[in-house]
UniProtKB/Swiss-Prot annotation:
Recorded family membership: Belongs to the ClpX chaperone family.
Entry keyword annotation includes Nucleotide-binding: yes
Pfam families the UniProt entry points to: AAA_2, ClpB_D2-small, zf-C4_ClpX
Purpose: ATP-dependent specificity component of the Clp protease. It directs the protease to specific substrates. Can perform chaperone functions in the absence of ClpP.
Entry keyword annotation includes ATP-binding: yes
Chain residues that bind Zn(2+): 10, 13, 32, 35
Species of origin: Prochlorococcus marinus (strain MIT 9312)
Gene designation: clpX
Subunit note: Component of the ClpX-ClpP complex. Forms a hexameric ring that, in the presence of ATP, binds to fourteen ClpP subunits assembled into a disk-like structure with a central cavity, resembling the structure of eukaryotic proteasomes.
Full protein name: ATP-dependent Clp protease ATP-binding subunit ClpX
């Protein structure tokens, strides 16, 4: 240890404590703030040189330049998946919703075709001042459907197939700038985080804004008071949906004038907005059936036809712009989401198919879970139907299926891991009907297991 000196000096540049702002002591050495700054500059230069020399390596291409095909959207027209291919992949993951899947497949194909066209035109005109090429505008997507109908799943599956960054945002947490809540730019931060803060990759991603119906303004007529979580949020989202250079705080939260922000171009990001829009069908029915309200002289047959015309399940197929305006969305907001897909309410048959058909079906998931305990799980066909019927009664769509099976399997998954003699377990309709009153009977080693069910 060096002898203490009343006039401490930097061990690197020799300047005394009085000549520098800060002198940091270590075990027998001292370093001043100026030498620290110099060291940082040297390290930064070395880091930049290393990046420049290694950018051609496969590892760096994968993370920084997005040349890895599984980490970037192919921007060659011949490489973009065709609508039939996109829908085929959706069919493997999502049961039903044929019309919505077709609309989404075409919209997504056109979106990434537009990006490929933009890259092609930019490279063609990089050395030319001629800008006569047609500019293709972006078409965002609006998904309307009851809870549990598959809105989020469709968006997630699209992003999985295209292998692009995907982020989900909740519209109910957003507020107008200057009020307590999240700024709309925080939506972009989630996408950046999914892209490992890679701006170029994030700009090819998909953002799903859930509960978009919850930011409808509270009344059809503009109010004199500010609606900071309704119409105010719609106004704040306009430029982002249309395409702008947004400033995103890297740490989230509110933007600060003295903090650096990340700039991201939203014109290449596909926005998919989804909501249940409870009550929208009533608005459509009122518009369509307004001439048949009250007593009429029409025949009974005509009255039956009118009832069919305004059937709640089919009324949203006749959705018009004015209906969304009456619901509470401002015309400017609707104009920036030109593609609209209406999802059907799930039927009992569809719920039954959801249990068994998709790649990640719930039945397959629980079979995999029990296989880890060396137990083969089986479902009788009648039990699957009974589970679907119970889910249909709960009116929460496909979400009810997992809740029911979790309740059904609770005692089974609690007991089976400790049962060495059980190699097979079968879920029966009676177990579902009797609210999961089955019991496992422990048998001697080597004997088959049976299930006792209460009457």
């Amino acid at each position: 240890m060096a002898k203490f000196d009343a006039h401490l000096k930097c061990s690197f540049c020799g300047k005394s404590q009085d000549q520098v702002r800060k002198l940091i002591a270590g075990p027998g050495v001292y370093i001043c703030d100026e030498c620290i700054d110099l060291c940082n500059e040297i390290l930064d230069e070395e880091l930049l040189d290393n990046q420049a020399n290694t950018n051609n390596s496969p590892q760096v291409k994968k993370k920084l330049t997005n040349d890895n095909p599984k980490k970037s959207v192919p921007l060659e027209l011949t490489s973009i998946p065709k609508p039939l291919e996109i829908k085929s992949f959706l069919d493997n993951q999502v049961v039903g919703q044929e019309s919505a899947k077709k609309i989404l497949s075409v919209a997504v194909y056109n979106h990434y075709k537009r990006l490929a066209w933009k890259v092609k035109e930019e490279s063609k005109n990089s050395n030319s001042t001629d800008s006569q090429a047609t500019k293709l505008q972006k078409s965002n997507i609006l998904l309307i459907g009851p809870t549990g109908s598959g809105k989020t799943l469709l968006a997630q599956t699209l992003a999985e197939f295209l292998d692009v960054p995907f982020a989900v945002a909740d519209a109910t947490t957003l507020t107008e700038a200057g009020y307590v809540g999240e700024d709309v730019e925080n939506i972009l931060l989630r996408l950046l985080q999914k892209s490992e803060m890679n701006v170029e990759l994030a700009q090819k991603g998909i953002i799903y804004i859930d509960e978009i119906d919850k930011i409808a303004r509270k009344s059809e007529n503009p109010s004199i008071t500010r609606d900071v979580s309704g119409e105010g949020v719609q106004q704040a989202l306009l430029k982002m949906l249309e395409g702008t250079i947004a400033n995103v705080p890297p740490q989230g939260g509110r933007k600060h004038p003295y903090h650096d922000c990340i700039q991201i171009d939203t014109s290449q990001i596909l926005f998919i907005c989804g909501g249940a829009f409870i009550g929208l069908e009533d608005i459509v029915q009122k518009r369509m059936g307004k001439h048949s309200i009250g007593f009429t002289t029409n025949s009974d047959q005509n009255n039956v036809d009118t009832k069919k015309l305004v059937e709640p399940r089919d009324s949203l197929k006749n959705l018009e712009l004015d209906d969304l305006v009456k619901y509470g969305l401002i015309p400017e907001f609707i104009g920036r989401i030109p593609v609209c897909a209406v999802l059907d309410r799930l039927t009992k048959e569809t719920l039954e198919s959801i249990l068994t058909q998709p790649r990640d079906a719930l039945v397959k998931q629980f079979k995999t879970l029990l296989s880890m305990d060396n137990v083969e799980l089986k479902f009788e066909p009648d039990s699957v139907e009974a589970i679907a019927n119970e889910a249909y009664k709960r009116k929460t769509g496909a979400r009810a299926l997992r809740s029911i099976i979790e309740e059904l399997m609770l005692d089974v998954m609690y007991t089976l891991p400790s049962e060495k003699n059980v190699k097979e377990f079968t879920i029966t309709k009676k177990m579902v009907d009797n609210l999961f009153s089955s019991k496992i009977v422990k048998l001697p080693s080597g004997s088959k297991r049976i299930i006792k069910e209460s009457a």
